[in-house]
Amino acid sequence: MTKSELIERLTLKHELPPKQVEASVKEILEQMVQSLSQGKRVEIRGFGSFSLHYRAPRVGRNPKTGDPVELDGKYVPHFKAGKELRERVDTLS
C-alpha cells in the first residue's frame, strides 16, 4: 500500500475531504521523522516501533570498479513489528 492508497482508503471510509486526510497523514509521518531525527523511539502499540540502529564504519566495495571504499558509520531507521501485527499477519499463511 502506498501513501496515496492509504489516503484514498481513509477518505472513503470516514467520508472526509481528501485534502484534510492527506494533510493529517503527512503530519503524522513528519512527526515520526522528527522524533527519529532527534534520536527518539516511536512506538505505536499493537503495530510496532521505529528506532535508530547504528551501522559501524566499514570497508565496502565499489560495485562498478571493485575497488575498496571506506564507509562512514551512520544511523539507519529500524522497524520492529508489534505482537498484535505479527499475530494478524501470521494468520494469513
From Swiss-Prot:
One MF term in the entry's GO annotations: structural constituent of chromatin
InterPro entries per record: Hist_DNA-bd, Histone-like_DNA-bd_CS, IHF-like_DNA-bd_dom_sf, IHF_beta
Pfam families assigned to the protein according to its UniProt record, in alphabetical order: Bac_DNA_binding (PF00216)
Disulfide cross-links: none
Keywords on record: DNA recombination, DNA-binding, Transcription, Transcription regulation, Translation regulation
Gene3D superfamilies hit by this protein: IHF-like DNA-binding proteins
GO BP annotations, alphabetical order: DNA recombination; regulation of DNA-templated transcription; regulation of translation
SUPFAM superfamilies in the record: IHF-like DNA-binding proteins
GO terms for cellular component: chromosome; cytosol
Domain of life: Bacteria
PANTHER family per the UniProt record, alphabetical: DNA-BINDING PROTEIN HU, INTEGRATION HOST FACTOR SUBUNIT BETA
Subunit structure: Heterodimer of an alpha and a beta chain.
HAMAP family tied to this protein: IHF_beta (MF_00381)
Described function: This protein is one of the two subunits of integration host factor, a specific DNA-binding protein that functions in genetic recombination as well as in transcriptional and translational control.
Family: Belongs to the bacterial histone-like protein family.
Annotated protein name in UniProt: Integration host factor subunit beta
Protein's organism: Idiomarina loihiensis (strain ATCC BAA-735 / DSM 15497 / L2-TR)
Gene that encodes the chain: ihfB
